[in-house]
């Protein structure tokens, strides 16, 4: 199956993760709920390693491909924090925390990276390591 079809199969989950993260914004290094959600998902996807608590709330996942071990590694990253802004839009997934909002896209970036991690962990049709 082409990769785009595989990713499309997970679109509803990716959207739900984004909406959940958007509704529960956290600032700077105090992204404990978001970090726990990310770590839980990465572990459920079957990553080779999931390390938490980096720089207080950072999360790192490691996925090793099934190809010949070339020793190559690529890093994918996303910020998880929100901004100290009051959300005034009336959406079903509107911020539930006064004075905090995902106004810069980190909720979407985190959800998309979770989708990529899920796809890579399920397929592993690459050579090297993704961190």
Question: Residue locations for each model-derived region?
Answer:
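Acidic/His- and Gly-rich active-site-bordering loop/insert found
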Residues: 1-102, 111-114, 118-127
